[in-house]
């Protein structure tokens, strides 16, 4: 009976392996059929007979072979490289490959049958079938093994139902086949292997304490490298006795530090690493292995969890300094002003040396807003890479050079899955203007987000799944197996240093206490915390393992713990009288700069440039190579600019900007301009990058001014505000010599990056003593384009202004724009600059300047006079100061609306005074100017609604000024749009009616 049942199965197996009616061959058969319909003699006689019997309609056959009209002719692209593709499942190809190899071996006498005789055709078929099935099983482990890995230290995670997808029986192997050697063509580092030998390697590699996800990677070289690195009989996680003792020592330091603070400062927030101590030896391994592979610097960013441990055990911050902060002391010397921040937000830097390789480490200060430090770290790393290479032209920096600086980001599991800025940063990782040769992401996966379980905080199996979108390899690892964690860190570092791509380590661990030390986690996670209380610490578990291996004794471990505690006691005593001796914020690249003071209230800097130099730069700005085909509209643009440079008149906004950039570049200041569509400019005004109309080659005049100049980079960024602005802020922290600018497509969209403005740009210097010279260009102006294309929300930035933290300007002339940009680099301190930039003024006939206004003794003016006061050829001549009836103060584009309306009405007793810089507020200068008009009525006019714009900010300042000059009118009158919920109307008729109304109010 059994034999009868077996026979049909055997026949089916042979048929399955030999039949041409296999799904993978469908395309081939259809093409053959179409060929037959064209010319029956063009196919083999056997096929001819076969097709003749089908009797299908010839047109249908041809149509079928062509496929649908929308298909791409070159699609799908044939897989290359690896024996088995991760995606195509083309087993017929594999079978053919294996069969050919087996036939070759049989012919050479290398492959023999059971009786020791050469393989028969049937035995070759059987052997090929075994090989294909074995490779299918191996592929299943590579793809799905991580789901069966032993990752959760608490053992609470539910085992997935795998439908026996990894069982040998699923691939046709019975226990009777287990002793048979199967040809696997060195797939696991073995030419032949039995099923148990394969399972031993596969389970150890993919289902142990490490689970690897890499089959989503499409680059065959990267996949093959990972397989080669972890698969094979000799690829076990193995450490020398010294290595194991070093891991134990680091774990004891990490655990001992947390326990010591818990005793000394009971209940104080420290966001301890308890439960995730394996992080510390893993970070050491990253620095050590990276150093061996050429790493020079690591820029770290991390949240609060375990930060103090990283600062002290990895960064080498003195324990006494941390204990000093715990008792409420400041982290800065007494003579340094600042508002300070909590201890688990502070940064630090140090040098570590392993095996003679010195690596500089810097931990970036950050707010509590999770993951927002990520782009800042990437930007800092990019600037450090540029400084290391010393870029002078638009050459591409090789990724092997960029790889010398590593951005290393530590994440929480819930935040990595939840915060959108994570995906934005992953999106930046491969872009030319933002790539950093791969960020190493380390997720401290304590399987909870404050009080929220993973099932409620993400829709994917792992927190790391978002990283699959950029094909990053992901190493999941059990935090209670320190050797596995250190091994994963080592392989991840090697991958990054080899391929210069991002990589993720997802360390499953737990949080021994609550979210902070004053929290009771059992309210919401009773079962998890019951398991945690019964669970031994990582140090206990690893100590027991090493004792069992005979490497250490319990006495050795107790002695190591006691020695460490004694060291901490000494540091604790020293911390009671500890005084920080110097602030490090003006070291390194920042040497030579100082903190700003009010000794020079105008703070102009020397921003003028000789006319001769400006003309030389201008000449280069309009030159293109002979064989370069410029678009005819761009050629007109260049011709107009050439005329401006020749006459020295009519300098428009974009030309003034290019002259500012060019003059800084020849003075050795690199320019980095980033944002959406900045090469051309949202309003087609900039055109600093030209494209050949025939081959799309680029030419950048600003990089061809003179030999030895600094580089100009215009980077069309991805469609993101938050990550890109954070990145540029980070860049500005590392390179104070560079003018770093971020431009919003419209200022209205800048609030997509509000966290960066609030947490870093406006407050970073006061909180963390970190200066930045970042410039934010925010197109702003009411022109009837509706509520999302009118307002950069000037009021938001003014509300953030205090303690001389940043500058806010709304300038109206190209000359003033030229000077304010150069001023950023021409003073010995750095402050962020928030600029409301124009839209309609870019081509306004009045918004022009002369070369004379950019040279000589000229400089930036915080206030600008009425053009009618000093331009002789204006339409009206103003009355003398004493006869001026009203002074209308304003800022930005509305000045030109007021000017034209006044001219139209022939009014000569209303003076228009522009406030070009709103903060720091030019109070003294305003006292001088308004003293001329003590008896005049004072009006503040703005185009924004009353609850927006500068009104609420400037009103108290203006009252203070009027009191000081003893003005007749002590209150300023408001003229502008009424308060509104939405910034602007979308109806042009309503826009014009509102404009007419407030112009009447201001001038009537």
Swiss-Prot record:
Keyword Oxidoreductase: yes
Gene, per the UniProt record: sucA
InterPro entries associated with the record: 2-oxogl_dehyd_N (IPR032106), 2oxoglutarate_DH_E1 (IPR011603), 2oxoglutarate_DH_E1_bac (IPR023784), DH_E1 (IPR001017), KGD_C_sf (IPR042179), ODO-1/KGD_C (IPR031717), THDP-binding (IPR029061), Transketolase-like_Pyr-bd (IPR005475)
Keyword RNA-binding in record: no
UniProt name for this protein: 2-oxoglutarate dehydrogenase E1 component
Function according to Swiss-Prot or TrEMBL: E1 component of the 2-oxoglutarate dehydrogenase (OGDH) complex which catalyzes the decarboxylation of 2-oxoglutarate, the first step in the conversion of 2-oxoglutarate to succinyl-CoA and CO(2).
Alphabetical GO biological process terms: glycolytic process; tricarboxylic acid cycle
Top-rank lineage group of the source organism: Bacteria
Source species of the chain: Brucella melitensis biotype 2 (strain ATCC 23457)
Subunit structure: Homodimer. Part of the 2-oxoglutarate dehydrogenase (OGDH) complex composed of E1 (2-oxoglutarate dehydrogenase), E2 (dihydrolipoamide succinyltransferase) and E3 (dihydrolipoamide dehydrogenase); the complex contains multiple copies of the three enzymatic components (E1, E2 and E3).
GO molecular function terms noted in the UniProt entry: oxoglutarate dehydrogenase (succinyl-transferring) activity; thiamine pyrophosphate binding
Matches recorded under HAMAP family: SucA_OdhA
Cofactor(s) needed for function: thiamine diphosphate
EC code: 1.2.4.2
């Amino acid at each position: 009976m059994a034999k009868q049942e077996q026979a049909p199965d055997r026949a089916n197996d042979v048929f399955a392996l030999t039949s041409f009616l296999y799904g993978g061959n469908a395309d081939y058969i259809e093409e053959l059929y179409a060929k037959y319909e064209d010319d029956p003699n063009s196919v083999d006689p056997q096929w001819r007979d076969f097709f003749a019997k089908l009797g299908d309609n010839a047109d249908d056959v041809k149509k079928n072979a062509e496929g649908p009209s929308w298909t791409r002719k070159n699609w799908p692209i044939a897989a290359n490289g690896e024996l088995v593709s991760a995606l195509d499942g083309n087993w017929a190809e594999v079978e053919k490959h294996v069969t050919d190899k087996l036939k070759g071996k049989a012919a050479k006498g290398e492959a023999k049958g059971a009786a020791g005789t050469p393989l028969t055709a049937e035995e070759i078929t059987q052997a090929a079938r075994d090989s294909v099935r074995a490779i299918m099983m191996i592929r299943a482990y590579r793809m799905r093994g991580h789901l069966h890995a032993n990752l959760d230290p608490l053992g609470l995670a539910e085992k997935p139902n795998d439908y026996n997808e990894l069982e040998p029986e699923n691939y046709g192997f019975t226990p009777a086949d287990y002793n048979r050697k199967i040809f696997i063509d060195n797939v696991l580092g073995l030419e032949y292997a039995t099923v148990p030998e394969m399972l031993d390697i596969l389970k150890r590699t993919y289902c142990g304490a490490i689970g690897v996800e890499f089959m989503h990677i499409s680059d065959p070289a990267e996949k093959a490298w990972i397989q080669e690195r972890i698969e094979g009989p000799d690829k076990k996680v193995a450490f020398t006795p010294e290595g194991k003792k070093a891991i134990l020592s680091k774990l004891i330091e990490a655990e001992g530090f947390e326990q010591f603070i818990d005793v000394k400062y009971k209940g104080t927030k420290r966001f301890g690493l308890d439960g995730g101590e394996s992080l510390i030896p893993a970070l050491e391994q990253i620095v050590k292995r990276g150093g061996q592979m050429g790493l020079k610097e690591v820029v770290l960013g991390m949240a609060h969890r375990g930060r103090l441990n990283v600062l002290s055990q990895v960064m080498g911050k003195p324990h006494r300094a941390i204990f000093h902060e715990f008792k409420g002391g400041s982290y800065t010397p007494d003579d340094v002003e600042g508002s300070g921040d909590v201890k688990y937000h502070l940064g630090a830097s140090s040098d570590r040396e392993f095996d003679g390789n010195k690596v500089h480490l810097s931990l970036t200060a950050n707010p509590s807003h999770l993951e927002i430090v990520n782009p800042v770290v990437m930007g800092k790393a990019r600037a450090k890479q540029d400084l290391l290479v010393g870029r002078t032209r638009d050459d591409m920096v090789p990724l092997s050079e960029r790889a010398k600086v590593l951005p290393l980001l530590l994440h929480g599991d819930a935040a990595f899955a939840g915060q959108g800025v994570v995906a934005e940063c992953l999106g930046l990782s491969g872009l030319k203007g933002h790539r950093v040769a791969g960020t190493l992401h380390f997720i401290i996966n304590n399987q909870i987000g404050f009080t929220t379980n993973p099932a409620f905080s993400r829709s994917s199996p792992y927190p790391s799944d978002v990283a699959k979108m950029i094909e990053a390899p992901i190493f999941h690892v059990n935090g209670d197996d320190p050797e596995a964690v250190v091994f994963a860190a080592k392989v991840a570092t090697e991958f990054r240093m080899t391929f210069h791509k991002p990589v993720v380590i997802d360390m499953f661990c737990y949080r021994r206490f609550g979210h902070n030390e004053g929290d009771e986690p059992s309210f919401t996670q009773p079962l998890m915390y019951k398991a945690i209380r019964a669970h031994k610490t990582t140090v206990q578990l690893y100590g027991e393992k090493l004792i069992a291996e005979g490497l250490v004794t319990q006495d050795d471990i107790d002695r190591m713990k006691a020695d460490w505690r004694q060291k901490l006691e000494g540091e604790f005593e020293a911390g009671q009288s500890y005084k920080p001796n110097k602030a490090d914020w003006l070291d390194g690249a920042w040497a030579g700069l100082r903190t700003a003071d009010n000794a020079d209230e105008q703070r102009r800097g020397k921003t003028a440039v000789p006319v001769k130099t400006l003309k030389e730069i201008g000449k280069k700005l309009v030159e293109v190579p002979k064989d370069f085909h410029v678009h005819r509209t761009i050629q007109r643009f260049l011709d107009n600019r050439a005329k401006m440079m020749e006459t020295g008149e009519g300098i428009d906004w974009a030309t003034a900007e290019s002259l500012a950039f060019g003059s800084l570049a020849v003075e050795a200041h690199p320019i980095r301009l980033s944002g959406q569509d900045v090469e051309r400019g949202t309003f087609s005004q900039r055109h600093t990058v030209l494209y050949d109309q025939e081959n799309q080659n680029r030419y950048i005049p600003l990089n061809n001014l003179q030999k030895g100049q600094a580089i100009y980079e215009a980077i069309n960024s991805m469609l993101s505000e938050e990550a890109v602005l954070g990145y540029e802020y980070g860049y500005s922290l590392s390179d104070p010599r560079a003018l770093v600018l971020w431009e919003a497509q419209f200022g209205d969209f800048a609030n997509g990056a509000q966290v960066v403005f609030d947490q870093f740009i406006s407050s970073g210097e006061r909180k963390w003593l970190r200066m930045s010279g970042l410039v934010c260009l925010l197109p702003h102006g009411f022109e009837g384009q509706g509520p999302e294309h009118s307002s950069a929300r000037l009021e938001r930035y003014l509300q953030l202004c205090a303690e001389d933290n940043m500058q806010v300007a709304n300038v109206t002339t190209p000359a003033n724009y030229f000077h304010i940009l150069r001023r950023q680099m021409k003073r010995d301190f750095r402050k962020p600059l928030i600029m409301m930039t124009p839209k309609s003024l870019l081509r306004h006939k009045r918004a022009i300047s002369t070369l004379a206004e950019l040279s000589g003794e000229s400089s930036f003016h915080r206030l600008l006079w009425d053009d009618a006061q000093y331009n002789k050829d204006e339409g009206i001549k103003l009355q003398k100061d004493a006869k001026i009836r009203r002074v209308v103060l304003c800022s930005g584009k509305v000045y030109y609306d007021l000017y034209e309306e006044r001219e139209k009405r022939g009014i000569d007793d209303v003076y228009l005074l522009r406030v070009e810089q709103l903060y720091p507020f030019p109070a003294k200068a305003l006292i001088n100017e308004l003293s001329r008009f003590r008896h005049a009525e004072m009006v503040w006019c703005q185009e924004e609604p009353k609850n927006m714009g500068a009104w609420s900010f400037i009103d108290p300042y203006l009252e203070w000024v009027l009191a000081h000059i003893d003005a007749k009118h002590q209150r300023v009158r408001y003229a502008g749009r009424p308060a509104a919920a939405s910034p602007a109307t979308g109806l042009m008729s309503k826009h014009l009616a509102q404009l007419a109304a407030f112009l009447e109010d201001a001038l009537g």
